[in-house]
């Protein structure tokens, strides 16, 4: 089987037969209950057919195995593992009214990078967290103290991945849901700076980004700096050529917090314009926990 958007595509291979044939695949939960079904239709002489299971995220993530109806033996059963779980991603911009503005909106590049690979959700923080969610991305969005901070802290502690992007708002109002304390914003190559824009260093071993090629054309013109500390080095997943952090991360409870020290737009860097941006986000989503479906849904 392979995933494609909200679909699970299953291929059936057989020896050729002289007449058209049909077969049925049944998706079952770990308790054996049927959750969905689809049909293969093969023409006379065909050796291969495909069935498509259209599954909402909460149901798809409960599928434990696929059975070929009426058949027995190992060739008629496929067990699904974590790779086939859908990972819903919530998006929260710093400014909702301009979030989708082409080229400059907080979510413009994020949505284009992730839409082909993840189920994206947009809503308030409260409503996003009311449903099972693997990843929540905050684009230059400080967290309000009180109920919102408590809810996001609980989301991370219970296994969620919180990805944050820096910006002027976060630099001005940092909060406690960051992997490292922030010090200040640094501008590179500006009229008041003698420093030139920085390139990216190779990703360190042990980073989820290790092995990804670093494009020479990506440069960083502004970033938020981290407070120096004894544990800073172990929390850096990506650096600039001068050694300062580009991405930091920290485990909290069962989950983790990841911070890009630049914006999710091209205002502070060329990173969102590059294919590397897509690859980095895909690796972070793949690191997250697939959500479990809710009980009570029956046959589709």
PLM feature segments, named:
Residues 1-300:
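N-linked glycosylation sequons
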């Amino acid at each position: 089987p392979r995933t494609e958007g909200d679909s699970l595509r299953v291929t059936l291979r057989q020896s050729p037969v002289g007449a058209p044939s049909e077969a049925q695949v049944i998706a079952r939960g770990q308790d054996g209950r049927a959750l969905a079904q689809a049909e293969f239709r093969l023409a006379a002489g065909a050796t291969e057919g495909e069935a498509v299971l259209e599954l909402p995220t909460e149901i798809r993530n409960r599928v434990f195995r696929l059975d070929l109806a009426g058949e027995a033996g190992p060739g008629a059963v496929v067990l699904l593992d974590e790779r086939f779980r859908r990972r819903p991603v919530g998006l929260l911009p710093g400014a909702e009214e301009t979030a989708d503005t082409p080229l400059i909106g907080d979510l413009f590049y994020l949505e284009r990078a992730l839409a082909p690979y993840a189920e994206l959700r947009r809503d308030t923080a409260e409503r996003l967290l009311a449903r099972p969610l693997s990843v929540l991305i905050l684009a230059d969005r400080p967290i309000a103290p009180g109920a919102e901070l408590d809810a996001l802290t609980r989301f991370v502690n219970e296994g969620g991945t919180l990805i944050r992007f820096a910006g002027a708002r976060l630099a001005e109002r940092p909060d406690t849901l960051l992997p490292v304390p922030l010090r200040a914003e640094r501008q590179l190559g500006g009229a008041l700076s003698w420093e030139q824009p920085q390139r990216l260093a190779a990703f360190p071993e042990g980073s989820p980004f290790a092995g990804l090629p670093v494009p020479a054309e990506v440069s960083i013109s502004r970033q938020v700096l981290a407070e120096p500390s004894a544990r800073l080095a172990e929390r850096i997943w990506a650096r600039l050529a001068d050694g300062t952090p580009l991405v930091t991360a920290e485990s909290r409870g069962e989950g983790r917090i990841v911070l890009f020290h630049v914006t999710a737009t091209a205002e502070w860097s060329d990173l969102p314009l590059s294919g590397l941006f897509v690859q980095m986000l895909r690796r972070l989503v793949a690191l997250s926990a697939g959500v479990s479906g809710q009980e009570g849904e029956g046959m589709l």
